[in-house]
Regions:
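Gram-negative outer-membrane beta-barrel transporters
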Residues: 1-60
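Extracellular loop and loop/strand-boundary signature of outer-membrane beta-barrel proteins
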Residues: 15-25, 65-70, 80, 125-130
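Short, intrinsically disordered/low-complexity patches at protein termini
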Residues: 16, 71-73, 115-119
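Generic, ordered loop/turn and secondary-structure boundary motif
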Residues: 27-28, 77, 101-102
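Surface-exposed coil/turn segments at beta-strand junctions on protein surfaces, enriched
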Residues: 29, 42, 74, 86-88, ...
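Residues that define the transmembrane beta-barrel architecture of outer-membrane proteins
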Residues: 30-34, 75-79, 134-138
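Transmembrane beta-strands of outer-membrane beta-barrel proteins
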Residues: 36, 47-51, 81, 93-95, ...
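C-terminal beta-signal and adjacent terminal beta-strands/loops
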Residues: 55-63, 85-146
Length: 146
């Protein structure tokens, strides 16, 4: 969505705190989101498979009361895959993998006058507030249908 909102923010003017307005995107709404899923199914041979990818663009993560001090979450990509083999006796074997790319969650404060003197790790000039990896997960299993 490309919706926005204008809110009051605080700003330092020398030693005084003043109020101004700032227009920003809606909280948590990415301007760009994409999903793609490829499926394969062979009922004759009992095979099913899927690869699914999704992209979520940069979005506002935490809103500050101060001008140009909001925390943003960088865009990220996720890739998942699954495969299943079914047998005529009702038994199925399956494997699933999630978050194959293990793209880190990157939260940052956008580069600007308030961050120019901050001595911290940066990404594209922005001050990194948090970087975390959620890891990949894998599952193997057996299923029996009566």
């Amino acid at each position: 969505t490309h919706s926005s909102i204008t809110t009051e923010k605080r700003i330092m003017d020398g030693n005084d705190v003043k109020t101004c307005t700032q227009t920003r995107p809606l909280f948590g709404q990415a301007a760009h989101v994409a999903n793609l899923s490829l499926l394969f199914k062979s009922t004759k041979y009992g095979w099913e498979g899927q690869i699914a990818g999704s992209y979520t663009g940069k979005r506002l993560s935490d809103i500050s009361n101060w001008y140009d001090d909001d925390i943003w979450e960088d865009g990220y990509m996720q890739l998942d895959a699954s495969v299943e083999k079914s047998f005529k006796n009702g038994i199925s074997l399956f494997a699933k993998a999630s978050n194959l790319l293990d793209t880190p969650l990157l939260r940052f404060i956008q580069n600007g006058p308030r961050t120019e003197n901050v001595n911290s790790e940066r990404n594209n000039g922005n001050v990194i507030e948090r970087k975390e990896w959620h890891g990949q997960s894998f599952m193997l299993g057996i299923r029996y249908k009566l």
